[in-house]
């Protein structure tokens, strides 16, 4: 079985001289090679379309409410199989064209082709050009944004100037009507300092600042009441409520002092002399009186012979 020219071209280790002889020998060989290249090129568009449809089907899977789970599975399976078949066919055609591509690369490297040098018909260079165009568009946009930023900065400066004018001119409003020359001078100064038509943003900002200035502010009333220091209590102990709890030893000393003072005076502190320290002393003194142990003399005077033990319930001892 004789091997045709296309089969001789699409095989490994094909030299450029052999490739040129086969094309010159039969003109239809060049057409067959061109058809193979176009067939592989045309297979790309269906693959892209099927890929887009497959992704859209997966994304809208939940919206397919009129189909059962089995129908959804079969639809996705058929679309995936179709996509796989197209990819395999394109891979096979592209793999068949590899010898021709390698041969043309060797021709560019080894042979001094000059004007006959082989160039790829379509490369990724257009992507770089598009990227450069996008970058130029982005640069123009950023330049426009810079202009807008400059304009906004100018508006901000105008607003600040308007606020300063309002703040400076407000104290003079309550001083009365000025004389004629003074009014003319102020009018002239106002005409020189700003444009006749102020921006709307500046007017709104100035009115807002004037309204805020007219609003009465709440003044903080300082605490003029002096702090009353209790005797025997340091200022550090008054910082926290827990610090007011003194140890048992100090409490005993205060109780003893209060008892001595009350015994010497014979009266309790009056209502006009009530202080936190006196309250603590009185409560401690009352507690001490209630918990005062009985004297041992009272125990010695008890008559144990007259105790009646008949009423005691002794059944629990049995």
Swiss-Prot record:
Gene Ontology molecular functions: transcription coregulator activity
Cellular location(s): Nucleus
A Pfam cross-reference name: Med3
Chain positions covered by the region annotation Disordered: 134-225
Biased composition (Low complexity): 192-217
GO BP of this protein: regulation of transcription by RNA polymerase II
Domain of life: Eukaryota
Spans traversing the lipid bilayer: none
Keyword Ribosomal protein on entry: no
Cellular component terms per the entry's GO annotation: mediator complex
Keyword Disulfide bond recorded: no
Functional description taken from the UniProt entry: Component of the Mediator complex, a coactivator involved in regulated gene transcription of nearly all RNA polymerase II-dependent genes. Mediator functions as a bridge to convey information from gene-specific regulatory proteins to the basal RNA polymerase II transcription machinery. Mediator is recruited to promoters by direct interactions with regulatory proteins and serves as a scaffold for the assembly of a functional preinitiation complex with RNA polymerase II and the general transcription factors.
Assigned protein family: Belongs to the Mediator complex subunit 3 family.
Protein name per UniProt: Mediator of RNA polymerase II transcription subunit 3
